């Protein structure tokens, strides 16, 4: 089958937003207007097309990024619907990694909200061009220009309206296009009948003012346009659109649109903007990777003629076809039935069938081309972030960074008979979601699961029950603490046992220094002259890794430490890998005496929104929970407080806030960084873990 849409007519976009901004409804409307669905499903009725997991339909939130393909004005638009809840950050991150552009949906009453900030920051890190859709213009309190101001104040974004609303709340009836300088008036409930007419007289001054501001803002990113603007020459609509497109693709400018997806207004114009201003695969730089054989950097251009290269960005288990691997093809063509190389794992894989996904229905296709997104069946060893390439032109693409889990709980099956079933179910869920970890406590034999938050683990335990038919008892949530060293030190690990039979001998000197936050454990071999033979060096590193997994203070994993092996000795007969592993672990224990070991705890960025009269209560809550206020902002009669608070102190906060504000206060929290635990709290943790408390 020949290529249906050229690369220039392909768009890979994500829809991202804060939870409840109306993102899934917006995606639904896109599917409706592009002819993919015939009846609109409402999120609050639990019938949405993109939210296809049972829990998503019950909770009215999007958990997994469903990928779907639609068509608009002769273009193919691949859409990934991403979750807005902070516990599902990895879903947002991995979709951003494979997108070319995104639509950020705002609730026009609230403007930029905490999760909007998180996904905006991630999109900026990945260099993803964005347009902004101020949704819910029909809602009480909707304020388009306030929403635009929050883009400037909270995100420092160079964002400017290319549209203005006509009316607001119940009176929202149309949109002014600041490029064409025309009004689009909606005349029916489905938003399919639109009248284009002159701008109503009462809006003409405002429209002229904002068109002038738009031209000025765009001209600042474009020298030719700036010259014309300064010389007072007329700027044509085509010139303005071309300049907006260039600036948007270069992530220098963010066009802002408005509408109400629920009331079917503004979605078609937003689709036009996706085509007009967001990039095709040809507009973005060729993807870079490393050739595993030479270690050299290579690029793969968006072209069907280039060798095949793709990134696996999501694994899902489908009840009918089994394991699906979602891939973004960057270059070349992939045929069903062909073999590819998983360069991340160094394994050859066979592509069984290729499916084009539409929410939860699918169409089988023979091949997938550069710039497209599809799901492959038959890949056994491929996991999230793996590169798949032509066997003759191998390259490893940049992977997807996975954040560390911050919360954990103990799970056990309700019946002993379910033990094996639970293990298999948890393993399958962990394959789909890299931020979900499953471990067995070596001392107690208990199964411990870790993730990004309480909702994240709730949903996974729920899926265990629904999809794998395992009823589980769940323990209370626990914080995922870490340990580290705060001072540099040198330590010797000496292990010798020579009583009867073969002896054991290992002797190492290791220098330990604190590493930068987030860099993890780094091992350096600085042995000169073979005082520790080369074959025992890996055993020293492994010995350190194994003992660091259980910490030196309270049994928590150790992070961000550099270890340099610089001296030691060995015995011709008695030295072994085991002896050097033990010697390394003894060196770590010895180092702990002088390296100022400390426990680290996850700090959450908490955003609390409360009525003005409850501000004092909230400040008290933050202080009582060992938190510190980072900033405050007034919005009408409500106050928004941003604070850093340890996760350990946030359990049960929802109840406290609810009773203090009679249910009118809300809060959101997102993991921000790890920080040293105060000494007094540290002592309590150590006591508790040693069984004294």
Curated annotation (Swiss-Prot):
Binding residue positions for GTP: 17-24, 81-85, 135-138
This protein's record includes keyword Transferase: no
Name the record gives this protein: Elongation factor G
Pfam families, sorted: EFG_C, EFG_III, EFG_IV, GTP_EFTU, GTP_EFTU_D2
Protein's UniProt keywords contain Isomerase: no
Gene name as annotated: fusA
SMART domains linked: EFG_C, EFG_IV
Family from the record: Belongs to the TRAFAC class translation factor GTPase superfamily. Classic translation factor GTPase family. EF-G/EF-2 subfamily.
Stored PANTHER family: RIBOSOME-RELEASING FACTOR 2, MITOCHONDRIAL (PTHR43261:SF1), TRANSLATION ELONGATION FACTOR G-RELATED (PTHR43261)
Domain tr-type G intervals: 8-282
InterPro entries to which the protein is assigned, alphabetical: EFG_II, EFG_III, EFG_III/V, EFG_IV, EFG_V, EFG_V-like, EFTu-like_2, G_TR_CS
Localization: Cytoplasm
Keywords: Cytoplasm, Elongation factor, GTP-binding, Nucleotide-binding, Protein biosynthesis
HAMAP family recorded: EF_G_EF_2_B (MF_00054_B)
GO BP terms, alphabetized: ribosome disassembly
